[in-house]
C-alpha cells in the first residue's frame, strides 16, 4: 500500500506584504542527536515550493526541522537589517505522526517575528 501523505510549506512576507520569493529552506530529519539533511529548496514567486517537500515512500513518521534562511531573504529583498540580524535563521521543529496525512507548515515572516501553525 502506498503512502498518501506529504509535506508542504508556504511563506508570506508580512513586512513587505507579499509571498516570500526565493527564500532558502533546509529540511532535516532528526534521529536522536543526529540531524540529517533531506533536501534544500527555494520558494517560488507564490512563496511556495514547486511540489511537496516530501511525499510517497520518502514520507515517514518522525521528527523533522524546517530551517528558513530569513536573513538572506530579507537582505536580498533590500531590507536593511542590523548586524547581526535578529532572525538570521528560523528553525521549526515538528513531528509527523501519520504518514498518510498532509502536513502543511505555513510561515508568516518579518525581520523581527514569525508565526506558524499546522495548515491544511
Curated annotation (Swiss-Prot):
Question: Record keywords: Magnesium included?
Answer: no
The catalytic activity, as recorded, is: 5-hydroxyisourate + H2O = 5-hydroxy-2-oxo-4-ureido-2,5-dihydro-1H-imidazole-5-carboxylate + H(+)
Which parts pass through the membrane? none
InterPro entries annotated for this entry? Hydroxyisourate_hydrolase (IPR014306), Thyroxine_BS (IPR023418), Transthyretin/HIU_hydrolase_d (IPR023416), Transthyretin/HIU_hydrolase_sf (IPR036817), Transthyretin_CS (IPR023419)
- The domain of life is Bacteria
The UniProt GO MF terms for this protein read: hydroxyisourate hydrolase activity
This protein's UniProt keywords: Hydrolase, Plasmid, Purine metabolism
Decide whether keyword Transport is in the record. Answer: no
Positions with a binding annotation for substrate: 10, 48, 117
Q: What EC number(s) does this enzyme carry?
A: 3.5.2.17
A GO BP term, please? purine nucleobase metabolic process
- A Pfam family in this protein? Transthyretin
What else is on record for this protein? HIU hydrolysis also occurs spontaneously, but more slowly.
Give the record's family classification: Belongs to the transthyretin family. 5-hydroxyisourate hydrolase subfamily.
Tell me which PANTHER family the record gives: 5-HYDROXYISOURATE HYDROLASE, URICASE AND TRANSTHYRETIN-RELATED
In UniProt terms, what function does this protein have?
Answer: Catalyzes the hydrolysis of 5-hydroxyisourate (HIU) to 2-oxo-4-hydroxy-4-carboxy-5-ureidoimidazoline (OHCU).
Q: Quote the subunit structure annotation.
A: Homotetramer.
Q: Identify this protein by name.
A: 5-hydroxyisourate hydrolase 2
Species whose genome carries this gene: Rhizobium meliloti (strain 1021)
Amino acid at each position: 500500500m502506498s503512502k498518501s501523505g506529504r509535506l508542504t510549506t508556504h511563506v508570506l512576507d508580512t513586512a513587505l506584504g507579499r509571498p516570500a520569493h526565493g527564500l532558502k529552506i533546509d529540511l532535516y530529519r532528526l534521529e536522536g542527536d543526529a540531524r540529517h539533511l533531506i533536501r534544500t529548496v527555494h520558494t517560488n514567486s507564490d512563496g511556495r515550493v514547486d511540489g511537496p517537500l516530501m511525499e510517497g515512500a520518502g514520507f515517514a513518521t518522525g521528527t523533522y526541522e524546517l530551517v528558513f534562511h530569513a536573513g538572506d531573504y530579507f537582505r536580498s529583498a533590500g531590507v536593511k537589517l542590523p548586524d547581526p540580524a535578529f532572525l538570521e535563521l528560523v528553525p521549526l521543529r515538528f513531528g509527523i505522526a501519520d504518514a498518510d496525512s498532509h502536513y502543511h507548515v505555513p510561515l508568516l515572516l518579518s525581520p523581527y517575528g514569525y508565526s506558524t501553525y499546522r495548515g491544511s
